[in-house]
Regions:
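N-terminal cap/lid segment of alpha/beta-hydrolase-fold proteins
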Residues: 1-23
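The serine-hydrolase catalytic nucleophile loop
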Residues: 35-47, 182
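Conserved alpha/beta-hydrolase
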Residues: 50-69
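Alpha/beta-hydrolase active-site loop
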Residues: 74-92
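Hydrolase active-site cap/lid region
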Residues: 111-151
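Short beta-strand/loop motif that positions the catalytic acidic residue
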Residues: 164, 170-172, 176
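Conserved alpha/beta-hydrolase "acid-adjacent" motif
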Residues: 177-183
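C-terminal catalytic histidine-bearing segment of alpha/beta-hydrolase fold enzymes
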Residues: 195-238
Length: 238
């Protein structure tokens, strides 16, 4: 990525660290990373590929991750959604808004559709959660809830997707050992009002599909980037 601009956004007692990757086009893109050891660097290759196509993007490290730091127990699903909102406000993003979310970040992206207009959603190996877990701080209590058998079936994501009228791209991994394939299938099926939607399954890939997909500038990479751009442009009309 060229000409990265670092920024800090305030969220409660935390200083969220992020960066802006500029682009030629007016579309505004926010990337939300997943859980575990993930941080905004997971999006480096995807954001670079977007920049090559003229699209700028913003990403940040959630509380408990990367440069932002802090204890993961100081955050939660609702906290992560609030952190994304804080970044959107700080960067004044909002016109032709695209949100890209990976794994846990995909659920935060979905929840953002309840807070503001989002033109395009790109969900990569998306996780969804029961509402019972939404406000529970990360830690043993949160883990106990989400580890209940098929707890994700009770998610509110299906309803949210049913109300979504923008464009939707879901990228699933054929050999994902974390996210049941039913989840991306049902997200697409639930998006009955979407103006454009597509489910893309990456053959032979596991849950860590994001880095491997964009590190290798293969014909598959170019094909999937075509889908990403189509999703962004389907609603923006650019």
């Amino acid at each position: 990525m060229d000409n990265l601009h670092a920024f800090t956004a305030a969220y409660r007692d935390h200083a969220l660290k992020g960066d802006l990757c500029p682009g030629r086009r007016p579309n505004e893109i926010l990337c939300i990373h997943g859980a575990g050891k993930s941080d905004r660097t997971r999006y480096a290759e995807l954001r670079s590929a977007l920049q090559e196509r003229g699209f700028g993007s913003v990403s940040f490290d959630c509380v408990g991750h990367g440069e932002t730091g802090g204890l993961i127990e100081q955050s939660s699903l609702v906290g992560r959604t609030g952190q994304a909102e804080a970044v959107l406000r700080a960067r004044a993003l909002g016109n032709s808004l695209t949100v890209i979310g990976a794994s846990m970040g995909a659920y935060n992206a979905i929840k953002l559709t309840r807070e503001r207009r989002i033109d395009s959603l790109i969900l990569i190996v998306p996780a969804v959660y029961t509402p019972d877990a939404y406000q529970v701080p990360f830690g043993p209590g949160f883990s106990a809830i989400i580890r209940q058998n098929r707890s994700w079936e009770k998610t509110d994501a299906w309803e949210h997707m049913g109300d979504f009228t923008g464009s939707l791209l879901v990228i699933a991994a054929e050999n994902d050992d974390v996210i049941p394939f039913e989840i991306p299938q049902r997200l697409i099926a639930s998006a009955s009002s979407a103006c454009w939607k597509k489910l893309r399954v990456v053959k032979g890939a596991g849950h860590a599909v994001l880095p491997s997909l964009f590190w290798n500038r293969s014909p598959l990479h170019e094909d999937i980037m075509d889908d990403v751009v189509s999703c962004i442009e389907s609603r923006s009309g650019k």
